[in-house]
Amino acid sequence: MSAASKSIDVMLKPLLVGGRPISNRFVMAPLTRCRADDNHVPTAAMVKHYSDRASMGLIITEATQIQKGYSTFAHEGGIYDKEHVDGWRKVTDAVHDKGGIIFCQIHNGGRSTVPSNVDEGVRIVAPSAVAITGHKCAGSFARNGKTQPYPVPHAMAAEEIASYVNLYAAAARNAIAAGFDGVEVHGANGYLIDQFLKTSSNQRTDEYGGSIENRCRFLFEVLDAVIQAIGRERVGLRISPLNSFNDQSDEDPQALTRYICSQLNLRTIAFLDVMRGDFFSPARGADKWAREEYEGVLFTGMSFEIEEAAKAVESGAADAVVFGTKALANPDLVARAVAGAPLNKPDPATFYTTGEAGYNDYPFM
């Protein structure tokens, strides 16, 4: 055994996730890559991409759209009709054939959606009529390739909120039909659920706004509906209490984190995935708040080096660590970690382009 493998030995231990053992503590982060076809059906390139990374203890897919005609990203995957189910089945079969485990991240963008990606007659929605103003939609995410401002979204009525809860549950059922081992509910990074959670984007005065309990109401209605649809052992949740991406902030992120964790303790889901900090600042600590409060399986991530991840797992600060760009650029990340081999460097210029370049051409050792 190499010195490198000894230092990360704890990362190679199996872990029970929802009653199912995963082979190691390396988790592939949900990474938007925009490689699905025009109808949001997974492509052959996606089959290869995910199956090449089957040695990760758990794969979590890219954010996968739950609603027809509401595309947050051009060429994102969808999970709202049979065509998507059939397409994802090819991915899950390929991952399972290599002994891997894969969850589908189910997602809606809310106000963080490119206007030109939304079908005629479909409204861009959010908890409140508050637009993103800190940046514009990147052309790489748009069907028409044009950079454009975010519009003021439509503030959802109570009956619309209920309809979105149903969309998440339907997407979860479709994911299981497609062969996924479970789903991760996307409650992070300024998308629809996170917009309800944070004070910067939720200015409601009804039962879905104001107090932490009210701002979390939509999250737990979604989570409970998904649990009812597919079983708690197949459900994970991702949150990003400190991340300012998409104009997000909260008046008391620690209290928000602790409340979410206290409520999750009553539900015994498969895992909680907490992004520890902010994309744009050194702020860190959300994982520590979660570990102090949450009694279940805890994943954390955001710019971890491999030995740092091993120390986090060894100390009990996390049960597994989520890797983004390292998994993106290294299909054999686990083997490289064991060997102490150098890692491929990711190419940001190809993160959101279509085709194989920067997607399936990163070499194995």
From Swiss-Prot:
It is an enzyme of class 1 (oxidoreductase). The keyword Transmembrane does not apply. It is found in: Cytoplasm, Cytosol. GO terms for cellular component: cytosol. Keywords: Cytoplasm, Flavoprotein, FMN, NAD, NADP, Oxidoreductase. InterPro entries: Aldolase_TIM, OxRdtase_FMN_N, Oye-like. The active site is at residue 191. Disruption phenotype: Knockout parasites show reduced replication within macrophages, but are resistant to bicyclic nitro-drugs including delamanid and DNDI-VL-2098. Sensitivity to bicyclic nitro-drugs is fully restored on expression of this reductase. Pfam families: Oxidored_FMN. GO terms for molecular function: FMN binding; oxidoreductase activity, acting on the CH-CH group of donors, NAD or NADP as acceptor. FMN binds at residues 30-32, 63, 105, 238, 303, 324-325. Its cofactor is FMN. Monomer. May function as a flavin mononucleotide (FMN)-dependent alkene reductase on substrates carrying alpha,beta-unsaturated carbonyl groups (ketones, aldehydes, carboxylic acids, esters, lactones or cyclic imides). The catalysis depends on NAD(P)H, which acts as a hydride donor for the reduction. Seems to be involved in metabolic pathways required for efficient replication of amastigotes within macrophages. Belongs to the NADH:flavin oxidoreductase/NADH oxidase family. This is Probable flavin mononucleotide-dependent alkene reductase. It comes from Leishmania infantum.
